[in-house]
């Protein structure tokens, strides 16, 4: 899935890649701060472990984005000197991992609301750590196998049965994760805003809902474009290439937006000066706001 097509070196290629680099640099700083604070400055709990790994996935995805776009711009200036390597497989690992983290966050939060007694009493202590480790391993395995059999969007082996099976399995995984994300998020919304036993809105709910919403608006188009190009065989002409560039910019915006969401939710309605640690801590707060509310982490089980 190379970003270049014959004769495509023009302002339409230059501007999107500059946007990717700019938003990517902002996102790298934001996700690095989130990773540092959650990894070394704050006590970890069930949901902060997922947020930490999501920040790592966003950081790696943006890093690949920046390298890819920078090399493309250098090739734009010196087409005969610099070879543009393919980062598609590497980029898909954090993309799949990020989607998996979001699905896991939303699903676990849904379970804590729908089955609160089971969640508090029967949930294994290290569930978040085990889940995140499994997500990284499976994401890497899926991408390596897909690249081994045919490569992402590589039409060279498109009629090979192993390639078709690998692409089908990868697409099925993405669709499954998307369905899980949507259903669990919908269940959370129903419990928050509908029925007599609706839950009170907390900052943790707001953080999760905004993160999922931004992914659906900005991160999902990249996966949809990949799916259409693989299975429906859309013509990779000017129109499809423009959509592809737009999807790439949106994915960079998605990974860049997550730290902004955390700090926005954590600082909302608090005018006084606070450290980034306190703001991020408040964004993961799982208790309803009160006039005398103090900063506290989620009441979920703490994980080492």
UniProtKB/Swiss-Prot annotation:
It is found in: Cell membrane. One of its GO terms (biological process) is G protein-coupled receptor signaling pathway. Residues 1-17, 68-80, 154-167, 233-244 are extracellular. It comes from the Eukaryota. GO terms for cellular component: plasma membrane. Keywords: Cell membrane, G-protein coupled receptor, Membrane, Receptor, Transducer, Transmembrane, Transmembrane helix. It holds the Pfam family 7tm_1. Residues 39-46, 102-132, 189-211, 266-304 are cytoplasmic. Expressed in a subset of IB4-positive small diameter nociceptive dorsal root neurons. GO terms for molecular function: G protein-coupled receptor activity. It is a multi-pass membrane protein. Belongs to the G-protein coupled receptor 1 family. Mas subfamily. This is Mas-related G-protein coupled receptor member A. It comes from Rattus norvegicus (Rat). The lineage of its organism: Eukaryota, Metazoa, Chordata, Craniata, Vertebrata. The gene is Mrgpra.
